[in-house]
A protein has these predicted regions:
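Conserved alpha-helical substructure of the radical SAM core
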Residues: 6-124
Length: 124
């Protein structure tokens, strides 16, 4: 029980609940649950497609295609450590980013599952 009467104090916080035996058992097997279920990261806005619904097409005069810098992705490390999954996608084709596999490896190193969405146009 917290000495300062904070959120962990059941006498001062009616929403406080002691962890159940099941919760303690599950945490002993799998670790504490992560704060975030998933974070989605747009690693690139570069795409060869011209889909009618996409900003590449609908906002062609304003759209800037570019890759995320590796240093920017690295700054997401604290969030990745609190997330169960990192989804690498966005309005671009993620496999066109030259560091895609490095980004996926960093997310795995943080303990995340990694997923992506691709149009598959450049899978050669």
């Amino acid at each position: 029980m917290a000495k300062d009467g904070g959120a962990a104090d059941p006498l001062r916080n009616p929403r406080f609940q002691e962890p159940s035996v099941w919760q303690l058992f599950r945490e002993s097997l799998f670790g504490k649950p992560r704060l975030l279920d998933c974070i989605q990261v747009e690693v690139t806005s570069v795409c060869p497609g011209r889909c009618v619904y996409c900003p590449h097409t609908t906002q062609a005069g304003y759209w800037r295609s570019r890759h995320m810098e590796a240093a920017t992705f690295a700054r997401l490390w604290p969030l990745m450590q609190e997330s169960g999954r990192v989804h690498l996608q966005g309005w671009g084709e993620p496999f066109l980013h030259p560091r895609f596999m490095d980004f996926a490896a960093l997310a795995r190193k943080a303990g995340c599952r990694v997923s992506t969405t691709t149009c598959g146009l450049r899978m050669d």
